[in-house]
Amino acid sequence: MGRGRVELKRIENKINRQVTFAKRRNGLLKKAYELSVLCDAEVALIIFSNRGKLYEFCSSSSMLKTLERYQKCNYGAPETNVSTREALELSSQQEYLKLKARYEALQRSQRNLLGEDLGPLSTKELESLERQLDVSLKQIRSTRTQYMLDQLTDLQRKEHMLNEANKTLKQRLLEGTQVNQLQWNPNAQDVGYGRQQAQPQGDGFFHPLECEPTLQIGYQPDPITVAAAGPSVNNYMPGWLP
């Protein structure tokens, strides 16, 4: 399979462009030399690099002679050459006059926009100048307003980001404070829980004392009750008595 067509375009990479230029330049000079030797042709080759460096090859003894021969062949006879030169000079002069008039008009317009040299202007020209200034002021104000709005939007975005970061830092600070409190007093919750559980047990322990007052220390039984209970005690005779 043959190679496909390669699109010719400028090489963007500077180093690759320089390397390709050196290779193609040497190849082109070699081809020009081979053409002049093999075919006995008069060949002149002029190359300027992108940096302005000159590379040339001429198969004859002088590049100037080859260029003179080229001019004679290109412009024809001397009469034709003179007429062509005159036409070229006339065209160049006309182009120069046009560019000069354009430059002077731009300079005059710039001075008028700055408020200078307004005396020669007519009423219509002054009105046109005023409209131009109004349009320019509107564009300037619109650009300034848009720039200020963009700055305000950017500041609001930064403010929102700072507020979110502040909230996050406050939350982390609060969590860190709680963790430090638990580390300094790890039994705080256990002590409170023990107190809550011990209170019902104390109430149940002392509750029978209130219901049975006869169990109090230093209580003397009623003698009548003891005397009544005496006969029942005497009716029982142990077996070891005589």
UniProtKB/Swiss-Prot annotation:
GO biological process, one term: positive regulation of transcription by RNA polymerase II
MADS-box domain segment(s): 1-61
Localization per Swiss-Prot or TrEMBL: Nucleus
Presence of the UniProt keyword Kinase in the record: no
GO molecular function, one term: RNA polymerase II cis-regulatory region sequence-specific DNA binding
Tissue expression as described in the entry: Expressed in flowers and seeds.
InterPro entries for this protein: MADS-box/MEF2_TF, MEF2-like_N, TF_Kbox, TF_MADSbox, TF_MADSbox_sf
Record domain K-box: where: 89-185
Pfam families noted in UniProt: K-box, SRF-TF
Keywords from the UniProt entry: DNA-binding, Flowering, Nucleus, Transcription, Transcription regulation
GO cellular component: nucleus
SMART domains in the record: MADS (SM00432)
Acyltransferase listed as a keyword: no
Annotated function: Probable transcription factor involved in flower development.
This protein's name: Agamous-like MADS-box protein MADS4
Record organism: Vitis vinifera
Lineage: Eukaryota, Viridiplantae, Streptophyta, Embryophyta, Tracheophyta
